[in-house]
Amino acid sequence: MSDFMPGLLDASYYDGALVALPHSRSVPVLYYNKDRFKEAGLEEAPVTWDDLKADAKALTGNGSYGYSCPLDQWYYMSLVMNAGGTIFNETEDGIGFAGDPGTKPLYLWKEMIADGTMHVPSGQDYNSSEACRNAFAGGTAAMIQQSSAQLKGLEKTCEFEVGVGAVPQDTTLSYPAGGSNLLMFKGHSEEEEKAGWEFLKYMTNTENAVRWANGTGYLPTRQSCIDSEEYKKMVEEDPNLQIIVDQVQYSTYKTPFIPQYQEAKEIFANEIQKCI
């Protein structure tokens, strides 16, 4: 188990027991149009929220926005965490975003929208994320906040050089890991359970984890993947991959394993829309 990336393995535990293995995992990142950055005299991705606002202002004009981000729970959570909060508290029986960590991301978005520097993609959930990526590829937005799993698709679709940076921070670097894990269900025969376990081990071994990361854009889930010659060659060909892998160490918050989580996500989506 020590070979799995800690920030990803932590999300595989429930009630102190390991119940799954990391597989298709991702982190939120900032994508930016390097051509537009060069035109605006900008060299690097914004590091802080103040940098984000300043860069978005410099990049806005001629029918194009500086920044775009879906108004959904996962991207809001990434900003909450970068402001020092969490969605649920440590015991998962209360909120962890009271006060500034919960309100500052909303004020950030509201200010940028009011300034005309932030594009709000239409739709909700995956539809909104797709609209955000389309705005980026079409030149309507110079920076977008999206999943690291979208890297290969954006690099293939965009007719400009795509850059990657960490999600800008307020007080700290911290991210919610996204994606999915692999697990087995109880209630099957011993033979079926043994076969299921062999399949999980096969899907998550180093060779297949590298192959999966290369073919899908999801993160390498093992340190041995990152250390492999095949993955090093991938990074050499596309340095954006290294920037994404560097963010995994900041995936400090696991998605809560509580029955109320799906309901909470829907409440967040609705209330964020009302606030903005």
Protein language model features and the residues they cover:
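Periplasmic solute-binding protein
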Residues: 6-44, 69-92, 114, 176-185, ...
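Extracytoplasmic/periplasmic substrate-recognition and gating elements
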Residues: 40, 115-118, 155-219, 223, ...
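C-terminal capping/gating helix-and-loop segments adjacent to ligand/active sites or protein-protein/ligand interfaces
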Residues: 240-276
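Glycine-centered hinge/linker elements that transmit conformational signals in sensory
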Residues: 55-57, 94-124, 167
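Hinge/lid segment of periplasmic solute-binding proteins
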Residues: 1-29, 38, 51-53, 79, ...
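Short, solvent-exposed loop/beta-turn-alpha elements that line the ligand-binding surface or hinge
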Residues: 1-4, 85-106, 156-157, 169-175, ...
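Short helix-initiation/N-cap motifs at beta->coil->alpha
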Residues: 47-53, 122-137
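Paired acidic/hydrophobic, glycine-rich loop segments that form the ligand-binding mouth/hinge
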Residues: 142-147
